A protein has these predicted regions:
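Alpha-helix N-cap/N′ positions at the starts of helices
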Residues: 6-9, 83, 126-136, 193-196, ...
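Regulatory nucleotide-sensing modules
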Residues: 1-39, 175-228, 237
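Phosphate-/nucleic-acid-contacting segments
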Residues: 127-177, 309, 316, 322-402
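TPR-adjacent "capping" and linker segments in tetratricopeptide-repeat scaffold/adaptor proteins
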Residues: 115-133, 184-187
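Short, Lys/Arg-enriched, Trp-marked, Pro/Gly-tolerant hinge/linker segments that flank
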Residues: 120-125, 297-309, 327-332
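Cyclic-nucleotide recognition modules
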Residues: 46-103, 233-287, 295
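Short, structured interface segments
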Residues: 91, 96-119, 161-180, 283-294
Length: 402
């Protein structure tokens, strides 16, 4: 393994918030103490955190290549182990407890971000993600004559809501379809699982404690919206889904159905060590995926912290650029591939009531609408203006809580 030992004096900056992760490394504290400081001020989110021996930091941005989410400062003379992102796989195979420690820290951070997002914007709460809604899902599938799927939803409703208001009706539906009240048992100790075409792997609103890796076949991810099935994605061999189950035992936000005969690897906290040892490439991909989730939540929170509607719209455009890791240079251009209405929806605005913001947005010299599609003629100008809006909002918030 190629790790470096780095020494930092008291007060030395290891990296700065919003800086590029160059080189792409993260750190483990061998001796000393490091403070993480986040400039973005949001109620419910820790602004400062002190880390000590054995703790790690900078994993998310090292693994994804996104800008740093906080500044890291050595508060005493410290010795750090610098780990290049491409050595991560080797590191976790030699220390599976470290991989699980990273997962646990991700869980805490995501929960913190999600709670803050919920507190700021009620529209971000997904009220449908509740086991009691399994009954409604079963009813919808029953009416569409998808009886196997309906039976699954009703069985899960009885399992998770044994004293629910619709228990009698759920049992009646199952009797009509000549289906058992209890679903077939799944051997949780078995990693490899086989699903026939059109078989449900899990459904929205169902509590989950496993993620899945597709070994063979393909899986359709969908969600029922206003009585209509919306396909969110079709995943193929090598893809990972249901990954939030390793972080938080919340109900599923979507349904997964085998698009063809499938062989999956089911991973939970109990067999995660085995995955790390036997399939380190998959474990690395999983932690990279979770790192993306954290970065996305961080940027969503930063966007919500901007008070000015135009600032939020511009920042949302910048997020799309950052997601694709497009270099921001003077006069560099970018085609966002989205309409003005799409952009309004992305920040939770109603397109029928907020057209004035789009009109104001297109007055910017570096923004244009080309056949309804938003384009940027100068990414550096976009980046600079978003920075101004962000600083302005932070000053206002800090004054309120001073």
């Amino acid at each position: 393994m190629t790790f470096s030992i780095k020494n930092y004096s008291r007060g030395a900056y290891i990296y700065l918030e919003n800086s590029e992760p160059v080189p792409r490394v993260f750190y483990i504290i061998h001796q000393g103490q490091v403070e993480l400081v986040r400039e973005m001020f949001t109620v419910g989110v820790e602004q400062r955190k002190v880390l000590g021996k054995g703790d790690f930091f900078g994993v998310e941005t090292a693994m994804t290549g996104h800008k740093r989410m906080e500044s890291a400062i050595s508060t005493v003379a410290s010795t750090l182990i610098e780990v290049p992102y491409d050595q991560f796989r080797i590191l976790i195979t030699r220390s599976t407890p470290l991989a699980m420690k990273i997962i646990r820290s991700f869980s805490i951070k995501l929960r913190e971000f999600d709670t803050a997002i919920t507190n700021i914007s009620v529209e971000h709460v997904n009220l449908e993600e509740d086991p009691s809604h399994l009954f409604d899902l079963g009813k919808e599938w029953y009416n569409n004559r998808r009886f196997d799927h309906a039976a699954y939803a009703f069985q899960k409703y009885l399992q998770y809501c044994p004293k629910g208001n619709n228990v009698s009706q759920a049992k009646l539906y199952l009797q009509k379809m000549n289906k058992p009240l209890v679903p077939p048992k799944v051997n949780k100790a078995e990693i490899n699982r086989f699903y026939a075409k059109d078989q449900i792997i899990f459904c929205e609103n169902e509590p989950g404690d496993e993620l899945y890796i597709i070994k063979k076949g393909s899986v359709k991810i969908s969600k029922l919206i206003s009585g209509k099935e919306t396909i969110l994605a079709v995943l193929k061999s090598g893809d990972i889904f249901g990954e939030m189950a390793l972080l938080d035992n919340r109900p599923r936000s979507a349904t997964a159905i085998a698009a063809e005969d499938c062989e999956l690897a089911a991973i939970n906290r109990q067999n995660f060590d085995k995955l790390v040892i036997e399939q380190p490439v998959m474990a690395e991909r999983l932690i990279t995926l979770l790192s993306e989730r954290i970065w996305t939540a961080y940027r969503q929170l930063a966007n919500l912290a901007i008070a000015d509607p135009i600032g939020r719209l511009l920042d949302m455009l910048l997020i799309q650029v950052e997601k694709e890791k497009v270099p921001i240079r003077p006069k560099s251009t970018y085609n966002f591939g989205i309409s003005g209405e799409d952009l309004l929806k992305m920040v939770g605005m109603d397109p029928s009531k907020n057209q004035q913001y789009l009109i104001e947005l297109t007055k910017k010299k570096y923004i244009e609408l080309d056949q309804g599609i938003i384009k940027c003629k100068n990414l550096e100008e976009l980046d600079k203006e978003v920075s101004v809006f962000r600083k302005r909002s932070m000053k206002k918030v800090k004054k309120q809580f001073a």
